[in-house]
Amino acid sequence: MTVAGRTVLIAGATSASGQAVARALVDAGARVVVVGSDQGRLDALVAEVPGVVGELADLTDGDDVLELAMRVHARVGDLDGVVHLVGGWRGGGGILGQSEEDYRVLERSFTALRYVSRAFWTDLVDSPAGRIAIVSSTTVAAPSAGSANYTAVKAASESWMQALAQGFAKSPDAAAAAVTFRVRSLAGLEGVLADAVVALWDAEADAATLNGSVTELVAPA
């Protein structure tokens, strides 16, 4: 089993990590749908990585996500994978510095994860090798006052992924897997992340082993 011939959607694809993942998946033979909220950045990504399918959507809007799902199904059919890269960081200032404004910006990534995973749930369950992956943070295991808002959102996202994993395990074929990657920072790890995503469809990457897993990504020694 490989990712070749699989159809994978990257949510929040216009970042450096999104571009790296898109390129690695295309090079490995996957069909890739890249989703972004900025038309200019999305157009640049489509031009930079030939072969990807670009889709503009606000992933924090439930109706927009449902419309996205209909367009994706019409253009490329059902998905085999979702890579959720919607994110960002705000923090500092201790507990008193954890502003409501910052939290509302950060929670958009969790909102997007919930909408996208629900919209493509049936695709992933029905696929012979459904995969959904997120990038979380090592701060979930060691929270700090200055990153309380950020870490709370990441912890909620990890909890959602464990719930998806339980749902996948109960499905008739149990062929899908929900995977969490943790990083201290994505800067400099774009290639490592891309390789890890492609490896989700390796022959030895069976769903039972992957499902519910949490793996820290680090730079090669």
What are these regions (language model features)?
Residues 166, 170-221:
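C-terminal helical subdomain
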Residues 14-15:
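Conserved glycine-rich cofactor-binding loop
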Residues 48-63:
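Rossmann-fold cofactor-recognition segment
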Residues 88, 94-114, 125-170, 182-187:
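Catalytic loop of short-chain dehydrogenase/reductase
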Residues 28-44:
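Conserved glycine-rich Rossmann-like NAD(P)H-binding loop of the short-chain dehydrogenase/reductase
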Residues 11, 77-88, 134, 179:
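Rossmann-fold scaffold of SDR-type NAD(P)-dependent oxidoreductases
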Residues 60-75:
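Conserved Rossmann-fold cofactor-binding substructure of NAD(P)-dependent oxidoreductases
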Residues 64-67, 108-119:
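Conserved mid-core alpha-helix of short-chain dehydrogenase/reductase
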